[in-house]
A protein has these predicted regions:
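Bacterial N-terminal signal peptides
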Residues: 12-21
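Short, internal strand/loop/helix patches
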Residues: 124-160, 278, 289-327
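Thiol-/selenol-based redox modules, centered on thioredoxin-like
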Residues: 31-39, 159-209, 320, 326-351
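Boundary at the C-terminal end of the N-terminal hydrophobic targeting segment
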Residues: 26-28
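Bacterial N-terminal signal peptides that target proteins for export
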Residues: 2-12, 134
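A short beta-strand-turn-helix
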Residues: 56-77, 212-236, 264-267
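Conserved redox-active cysteine motifs that mediate thiol-disulfide chemistry
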Residues: 81-98, 239-262
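Hydrophobic beta-strand anchors of alpha/beta hydrolase catalytic cores
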Residues: 78-79, 109, 155, 236-237, ...
Length: 351
């Protein structure tokens, strides 16, 4: 073999091997991403499996009501959380519709849009595009808290006895085995309905006055905010997700842009003493470790609180990212605005 040909052959082999290595690495990362979602979903539900599920009444987007207490004992329930901007959700939708068509007489299938950066205007066209025909709900956070939403998509299976049976993220053989198991479980004559839903928490509204607030940051620092005192400050709460800017860049660019805009603006505004800002992160696709990485990557100096149990999002009635809540020195909530509100840009400009 001539030296020149040998040289080109070696170069070709090197390039091919590099491409194979790159593909394998990318494929491994994709598998790890799915495995991470599966781990999060199972971890969130592990303490609930075997326990009674909530006897909730769910209203679909067409106005129908599904009373779970009337379903338990007769059929199992399959709840699937999803979002229009979620890439693996989109990938799983054909299979989701196939499950509904095949098993809808045997299992109560409920499609639950998380409501996070979604509304009726985004959900309806998505359902049509994906060809989804099962009952669909747009959550206000109630189902997410009751069923421990941590990832999108997330599967929740409830057996015929009305007990949590399975939590998952991936559409794999194990999930389908679990689905078949609850479907073919013997029907029970009697189910003890346990109201496992917590009483409705008070949700703060614009105009309400708070006496004080206390947080613990991801650095384990305590923040105590007392209102109505001489040294009280105006307070700004920013509800966000560490993935909002990069993950939504292509699938929900307006939301991604809003998250960047809010972060950059408040980073600048925090240098003044007019408002004391606190960032509060969602627990969906988030953890303390990821928030530390977010803080490092974006160089933000604002204190960050991880809402691990979702209670802060609940009591302030937040389900959109980003959402800004402003309180005066007396603790009165002066305004609450999210990316989906028409006055969002005006509020940002006025800060």
């Amino acid at each position: 073999m001539k030296p020149m040909y040998k040289k080109y052959l070696n170069l070709f082999v090197t390039v091919v091997l590099s491409l194979v290595s790159f593909y394998q690495q990318a494929h491994a990362e994709e598998i790890d991403y799915a495995a991470d979602g599966q781990r999060r979903a199972q971890s969130a539900g592990e303490l609930l499996v075997g326990k009674p599920a909530p006897d909730m009444k769910i209203t679909t987007i067409d106005g129908s009501t599904i009373d779970l207490s009337e379903v338990y004992g007769k059929k199992p329930v399959y709840v699937k959380f999803w979002a229009t901007w979620c890439i693996p959700c989109r990938e799983q939708m054909p299979g989701f519709e196939a499950i509904y068509k095949q098993y809808h007489d045997q299992i109560e299938v409920i499609s639950v849009n998380t409501g996070i950066n979604d509304n009726l205007q985004s959900v309806k066209p998505f359902l049509k595009k994906m060809g989804l025909t099962m009952p669909t709900v747009i959550d206000d956070g109630t189902l997410a808290r009751a069923l421990k939403l941590r990832v999108t998509p997330q599967h929740v299976l409830i057996d015929k006895q009305g007990r949590f049976s399975y939590f998952g993220h991936v559409d794999d053989e194990n999930f389908h085995n679990q689905l078949e198991r609850v479907i073919h479980q013997p029907t029970v004559d009697k189910v003890t309905i346990v109201n496992s839903s917590a009483p409705d928490a008070h949700t703060y509204q614009v105009g309400d006055t708070l006496k004080n607030l206390a947080f613990t940051t991801i650095n384990d620092n305590s923040i105590e905010l007392k209102f109505g005192e001489d040294n009280s400050a105006n307070i700004g709460l920013v509800f966000f997700g560490p993935w909002c800017e990069w993950y939504l860049e292509e699938t929900a660019p307006d939301s991604s842009k809003a998250c960047t805009q809010v972060r950059e603006l408040l980073e600048d505004k925090s240098k003044s003493n007019n408002i004391k800002w606190v960032s509060i992160s969602t627990n969906v696709w988030s953890s303390v470790a990821e928030l530390h990485e977010y803080k490092k990557s974006y160089g933000t100096s604002l204190p960050i609180v991880f809402d691990g149990d979702g209670k802060l999002f609940e009591v302030f009635g937040v389900n959109q990212i980003p959402t800004i809540i402003l309180m005066d020195k007396s603790g009165r909530i002066e305004s609450k605005v999210s990316v989906q509100d028409s006055e969002f840009e005006n509020v940002l400009t006025s800060l």
